Amino acid sequence: ALNEVIEKYNESQPNVTAVPSYDSSGTLLAQIEEGAACDVFFSAAQKQMDTLQNDDQLVVDGTRHNVVNNQVVVITYKGSGTAVTGLENLKDAKNIAMADGSVPVGKYTRQALVNAGILDAVDDVSTIPTDVVSQALGGVEINECANVSAVKTQVAEGSNEVGTVYYSDTYGLEDKLDILQVVSYDLTGNVIYPIAQVKNDEADELEQKAALDFVNFVKSDAAKTIFDSYYFDTNVED
């Protein structure tokens, strides 16, 4: 979706080159903290943005905005014949692909399992180890993945029977994946993606201005139309 948003932005700003870097929000945050050049951070969760803003003091004041909401879905590959219908009987899977707790989709999956009464509540669900999740699901084998793309790939290729990803991750894979359950916000909480301009001492004034302009475009109606088409929920409060 972001590639298409960038293309749309370049229709009116052809002289601006936006170079996206895709990975889990935790990995991207770590790269920024380690000094990687970055002008804009678009996170799949509030936690990483909170860290960048409050702990690292690297968010430009007044530039943080909520862009989209997303939903966690339980997926399987076409023709899997799985007995799983959703989180409530996830234990019936032969094996599961699941992101670790440091990855937003892994955190939201754990939160949903806590709220569904499958996992015990803890102060920070992102700290729940994958082996504890496995035990709560009757010892089912879990393939711990480093990011949501890895989960999607493992299930689409049939390496794992089921997995949890974002609804938007199923875009373009409708012929390979079946959605078993769209997990309600009541279980996961909101899955808000915030965006902000990042303080970058290496950027000149023109680059900083372009970064802010791009942030503002991402929350525009033109960008929302694109996000909607990729199964994101754009009905969010800023």
Where do the PLM segments sit?
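Ligand-binding clamshell of periplasmic/extracellular solute-binding protein-like
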Residues: 20-30, 37-53
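A generic structural motif
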Residues: 13-20
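Exported/periplasmic ABC-transporter solute-binding proteins
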Residues: 1-13, 26, 33, 46, ...
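Central helical "cap/lid" subdomain
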Residues: 56-65
